[in-house]
Amino acid sequence: MLAVIGVTNALSSNGSGTLVTIPEPRPEPVAMRMVGYGHAAIAVPKVWGTNASRCGIPHRDTVLIDDPAAASYCDLPRPPDVDSVELGTDPPSGFRVDDTFTLNGVRAERRRTSCSRDGVCWGAVGLPSLHVWFRASSSTSAGVVNEILSRIEILPDRVGVPSSRSPDDGRDGTAYAKRLEELGLKTEISTRTSTVYKPGRLVSISPSPGTLLSPGETVTLTVIK
């Protein structure tokens, strides 16, 4: 949660015995960064972490992108006042279409925000034609969830490095390179050997998924030879 600390108005004398109100200084705007998949992106505070979770449970404000910790299971409570947004290529568990709207000409589906007994609230926005879903959650309030989801944008002149997870290709390097090219990005292939993975397996991506690039920029893929 981002906290804004207010400054109490002060009264001072102008020398004639008249009290003058000193206005509060305006709070500094929160510095933001954009993350996304393809042309769908969302603004998050720069101070947020990336994949700052334990077993997929955020322990501080964070954006979740291909979170490796989500594969583990442990019964951990979410700390209070922690906000997050997760990017996915499929509807999140529990997603339903409560409302629809148009975002920069793209159909969007909204799962209304709801809160559980443990005080964690969540809601989501899906862009089916772009295969991108944003799931925001908060142990602060439902209002924070709605605020997070209001920062989704469609950026025709920017391309977010897509997720490496796909049920269709199983982290196949060739299939992922094709996805990048379809989005207008170039690829550079680096290879390494492995006694664990089969040839063609995608093992690393640089820059990482979620990073916004300009069309024509290069993404380096490391695959097993």
Protein language model features and the residues they cover:
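Extracellular/periplasmic catalytic domains that process cell-envelope and extracellular macromolecules
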Residues: 35-36, 125-128, 212-215
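Short secondary-structure junctions
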Residues: 47-56, 96-102, 107-114, 186-191
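Signature of long, low-cysteine stretches enriched in small and polar/charged residues
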Residues: 86-158
